Amino acid sequence: MEPSEGASPGGLVKEVDMPQAALSAPVPVTGTSGQSPMAEEELGIPIPAPGLLQVTERRQPLSSVSSLEVHFDLLDLTELTDMSDQELAEVFADSDDENVASDSHAGLHPLPRAGCLRSPSWTRTRAEQNREKQPFGDPERQPAIVDTILTVERPKED
C-alpha cells in the first residue's frame, strides 16, 4: 500500500482485518508490513490477539421494568398504606368498580356497594392492645374489633 498524505514521515499506514466476531471494521495500524506483532508492541502500538476479542456469547437485553407485571394482594397492600387518606381509599374503590363493570353486561350499571378495607396495622395494634387490657367477657370488646375495619362508601354514578 502507498503511504497516505496524513501519515507520519517514515511510517506506513496499513489496514489489518480482524475476524468479524472480534471487530466490526478494519483497524488502521501504523508500522511497516515486515514487522511482527511483537515488534509493533515495542513501538508502543499493541495489536490485540484475535482470541482475546472474540465474543463467545451474546445475551438478550433485560426486560424493562414497565413490562413486568406485579400483582399485590389487596389486603397486604392496605396494611402498608394509610387508609385514612381519602384519595387512596377512592383508588381502591375505583379499582373494584372497574372489575364489576367489566363483568357486567352492556347497558346495565352495577349497583354501588360499600366496601370494607382493613385498616393499617398501626391502628389494629392499638385496638388489640386495648382488647388485651379488657377481660374477655367485657361487652365493650366488640366495638374495639369494629374500629379496625374501615367502611368506604362508593360514590353513586348517575
UniProtKB/Swiss-Prot annotation:
Ranges annotated as biased composition (Basic and acidic residues): 125-141
InterPro entries given in the database record: Dysbindin
UniProtKB keywords: Phosphoprotein
Annotated GO CC locations: cytoplasm
Keyword Phosphoprotein attributed: yes
Highest taxon of the lineage: Eukaryota
Annotated region described as Disordered, given as residue ranges: 1-38, 96-158
Modified residues (Phosphoserine): S95, S119
GO-annotated biological processes: regulation of signal transduction
Disulphide-bridged cysteine pairs: none
Family under the similarity heading: Belongs to the dysbindin family.
PANTHER family cross-referenced by the UniProt entry: DYSBINDIN DOMAIN-CONTAINING PROTEIN 1 (PTHR16294:SF4), DYSTROBREVIN BINDING PROTEIN 1 DYSBINDIN (PTHR16294)
Record protein name field: Dysbindin domain-containing protein 1
Organism expressing this protein natively: Bos taurus
